[in-house]
């Protein structure tokens, strides 16, 4: 028998071997032999690898994705005290106002929120580990330019129930907007301010959009800084003209319903929350992070005149019924910025302290040193230098060459 025959391994056996490897090692193996290169780019193997990694997630390394707002560099680091770099990817969208979201190893990018005259409605997906980039088909709502919309919103996430990545695009066209609502006028009411919104939903599996129209929507503005996608539902922070009225908007891709969730009344009284609302995934739900400075705390607060961080978790009590539970409330020392930079894989919030990072234990509420001297850049308390989120590896998009 020839030596070459001894070297040959059946494809099924190779799949069983390669599915156990991290993405970076799979890609290295794909460069060794042409047949392996083709194998790891098949949808069957990508699905096989993904399923195995999920089954062994409890023993696999945990990662964090650091998004540097200054350099637009994406760095994947190990979620441990050393926080060593695993890989990095620099991208240039030509604008500091680029919208960004990540879920299950893929990153969604868009410039549609840029107010420059040359409106760019493109939405793209990026796999930073595989260095693969996919431009999505134009959203059916891209016909509404920046000047033709009252507000727009994007969300991106992985829906494990259907094993699909989803983009939700919502537009409130000026042509359907209600007249200006004056909360102090006895002649105006929120019912008079109802308007129609257009909703586009993209599926990566089908590489297509569907369009939905919903009437009787009454949110005047949607925060575009941060969105959350959990269990097939997208969440944003919304505002009405009366600045004391803040809410969480959600779109359920299973039912195609756009709805609202009230936030605890006192949250909206803190000025900081109106400027920088922050919601993040929290297990199978979402958490609202309330950063309270000493100047906007109330006298009946336990930590009055002391900066503190509150975490409220959304509870789904029953169908169409939601409530909030305070998960944690901790005082923040003077040398720690109250701005949350992200969360670790265990849910502990990450905050900046000079050039280092600290976390707060969700069980003990005690601060812990996380990373020393992570960056040579000094921390500007008004502008976080990083946003940090849990990250998992994926081979998705590696097969796009086969589709083109």
How does the language model describe each region?
Residues 1-404:
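N-terminal entry/capping and adjacent linker segments that precede and initiate structured domains
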């Amino acid at each position: 028998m020839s030596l070459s025959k001894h070297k040959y391994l059946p494809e099924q056996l190779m799949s069983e071997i390669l599915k156990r490897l991290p993405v970076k090692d799979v890609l290295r193996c794909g460069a060794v032999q042409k047949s392996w290169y083709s194998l790891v780019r098949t949808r069957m193997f990508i699905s096989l690898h993904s399923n195995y990694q999920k089954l062994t997630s409890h023993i696999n390394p945990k990662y964090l994705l650091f998004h540097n707002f200054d350099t637009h560099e994406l760095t994947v680091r190990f979620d441990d005290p050393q926080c060593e770099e695993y890989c990095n990817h620099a991208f240039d969208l030509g604008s500091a106002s680029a919208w960004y979201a990540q879920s299950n190893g893929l990153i969604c990018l868009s410039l549609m929120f840029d107010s420059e005259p040359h409106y760019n409605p493109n939405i793209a997906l990026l796999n930073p580990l595989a260095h693969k980039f996919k431009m999505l088909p134009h959203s059916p709502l891209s016909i509404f330019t920046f000047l033709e919309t009252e507000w727009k919103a994007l969300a991106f996430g992985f829906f494990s129930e259907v094993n699909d990545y989803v983009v939700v695009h919502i537009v409130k066209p000026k042509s359907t907007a209600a007249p200006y609502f004056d909360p102090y006028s006895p002649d105006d009411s929120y019912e008079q301010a109802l308007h129609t919104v257009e909703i586009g939903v993209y599926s990566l599996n089908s590489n297509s959009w569907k369009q939905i129209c919903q009437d009787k929507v009454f949110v005047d503005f949607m925060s575009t800084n941060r969105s959350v996608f959990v269990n097939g539902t997208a969440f944003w922070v919304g505002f009405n003209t009366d600045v004391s009225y803040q809410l969480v908007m959600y779109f359920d891709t299973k039912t195609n319903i756009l709805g609202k969730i009230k936030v605890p009344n006192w949250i909206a009284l803190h000025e900081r929350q109106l400027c920088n609302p922050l919601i993040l995934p929290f297990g199978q739900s979402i958490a609202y992070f309330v950063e309270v400075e000493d100047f906007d705390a109330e006298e009946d607060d336990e930590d009055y005149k002391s900066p503190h961080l509150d975490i409220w978790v959304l509870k789904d009590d029953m169908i169409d019924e939601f409530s909030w539970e305070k998960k944690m409330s901790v005082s923040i020392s003077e040398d720690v910025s109250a701005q949350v930079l992200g969360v670790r894989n265990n849910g502990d919030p990450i905050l900046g302290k000079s050039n280092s990072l600290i976390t707060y234990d969700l069980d003990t509420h005690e601060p812990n040193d996380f990373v020393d001297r992570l960056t040579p850049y000094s921390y500007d308390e008004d502008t976080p230098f990083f946003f940090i989120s849990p990250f998992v590896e994926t081979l998705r998009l590696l097969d796009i060459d086969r589709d083109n």
